[in-house]
Every structure is written in structure tokens, then in C-alpha cells.
A protein has these predicted regions:
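N-terminal, Lys/Arg- and Ser/Thr-rich interaction peptides
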Residues: 1-16
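Zinc-coordinating Cys/His ligand positions in small cysteine/histidine-rich zinc-finger domains
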Residues: 174, 190-193
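Short metal-binding segments enriched for Cys and/or His
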Residues: 193-210
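Short Cys/His-rich "knuckle" micro-motifs
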Residues: 176-179, 203-204
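Long, charged N-terminal interaction/targeting segments
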Residues: 10, 17-157
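Short cysteine-rich clusters marking metal-coordination/redox-active sites
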Residues: 166-170
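Short, flexible, mixed-charge glycine/proline-rich loop motifs
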Residues: 152-163, 183-184
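Short linker/helix segments within small regulatory modules
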Residues: 179-188
């Protein structure tokens, strides 16, 4: 569901740093760690386990890298490119989160941690994969199929009224003390993360202005 490619310029990160960055890029906890408004909330553990099982990260070190119209050498500042492939319908909603977490993880490995925020030495591309182009378990898996895979661990809770569907992404969310929720006009909405909540509220506000 999320395939990540990390391209590293010569001398940018040593082998230990590459392994550390790859592990962090492929960790569900890191993906949500940027959102202070989530109140420490993490994706429901059983859904998170399913989500994590779909992560794959590959690291490349190209022998030739040109940036700013010149060939980079080991003496140049580190350059990194991250390509994150996600289901097409999720690309818009996930882009800001993905760009933030990938940049943060790489910046923490640089001697100058402010560099990626001052110069375009780290670029992140979020690429939406067309529906039907993701294959898992020997068959095409569309966005709705992935939503149901993430929701499957909480079907019993939903039947018992202890889980609600996130109105933005459609994933079942168990109602826990730390669940991100919003009460609007007496109706309770639950969200898998703070990002879904914020986007939902923004869409409601926009609809209200219309």
C-alpha cells in the first residue's frame, strides 16, 4: 500500500544512517508523529499492524547525481529524494503528512538539521497509483479493499457500537479514551488520525460557506 524509495547522494548518509532512515520511513508511528493536534493519538493498534505489513522501503545510492546544474561530489551538502507511492485517491489527503514526516526523518540525520528547510536538498514526491494498479495477495487491491483490510480487525466492535467509521477515509475506528473524535450537533464522529479530523472539519466549513 505504501512503497517508498529513498535515493541518497554519494557521501550523504553512511550505511548505518541509511538503515536507520529506512526503518523509520517504514514505521507507522513515525507517519503520525508530526501531528501535535492529535493529542498523542496513534492509529488503532490492530489496524496499525495491518497498515505496517503493507510498508516497503528500498534505498538507492546512484553513482551519478546532478543538482543545480553540476555533478555532486562527497564534499557537497547531502541530497536525498524520497518517492512515496500511495493509492491514487489518497494522494491529496496524505501528501502534506508524508512530506512532513519524510523531511523530518532525513533532517535529523544531517549535521545541519535546518538545511532541508533552507535549501532544496531533500525533495519528497508523493505519487498516486491508479486504481487497480496495486496488487497484493495475487490480486488487484483498490482503495476500498485497503480500507476494508484496515477495518477488518474492528468489525465486532462496530457491530457492538464500540467502533465508528472515519467519515473521511472510511476506516473503522474503535472508541477508546485517546480516539480522535468530534461532536457536531449531537452526532459523534471518530477519526483514525488528527489529519482526517482536520480535513473533515475543513470540508464541513467550506460546505457551510457555500
Amino acid at each position: 500500500m505504501m512503497f517508498i524509495e529513498l535515493f541518497v547522494s554519494e557521501g550523504a548518509l553512511d550505511s548505518a544512517q541509511q538503515r536507520r532512515v529506512a526503518r523509520r520511513l517504514g514505521t507507522i508511528h513515525e507517519l503520525g508523529a508530526h501531528d501535535p493536534e492529535a493529542g498523542g493519538h496513534a492509529m488503532a493498534p490492530r489496524s496499525a499492524a495491518v497498515f505496517a505489513s503493507m510498508f516497503q522501503v528500498v534505498v538507492h545510492r546512484p553513482p551519478v547525481w546532478v543538482a543545480g546544474e553540476r555533478l555532486l561530489t562527497e564534499e557537497d551538502p547531502p541530497h536525498c529524494l524520497v518517492r512515496v507511492f500511495v493509492p491514487g485517491p489518497w494522494r491529496k489527503d496524505m501528501s502534506e503528512t508524508v512530506i512532513s514526516y519524510a523531511t523530518r526523518i532525513l533532517a535529523e540525520e544531517f549535521e545541519d538539521r535546518d538545511l532541508p528547510y533552507q535549501r532544496p536538498t531533500v525533495q519528497v514526491q508523493v505519487i498516486g497509483i491508479s486504481e487497480g494498479s496495486v496488487g497484493m495477495l495475487g490480486k488487484a487491491a483498490r482503495s476500498q479493499d485497503l480500507v476494508e483490510m484496515l477495518s477488518a480487525p474492528y468489525q465486532e466492535e462496530a457491530a457492538a457500537g464500540r467502533a465508528l467509521r472515519d467519515p473521511l477515509c472510511g476506516v473503522l475506528v474503535p472508541l477508546r479514551d485517546d480516539t480522535v473524535t468530534v461532536d457536531l450537533d449531537g452526532e459523534l464522529f471518530a477519526f483514525c488520525c488528527g489529519g482526517c479530523r482536520n480535513e473533515f472539519l475543513a470540508e464541513r466549513a467550506e460546505a457551510g460557506r457555500g
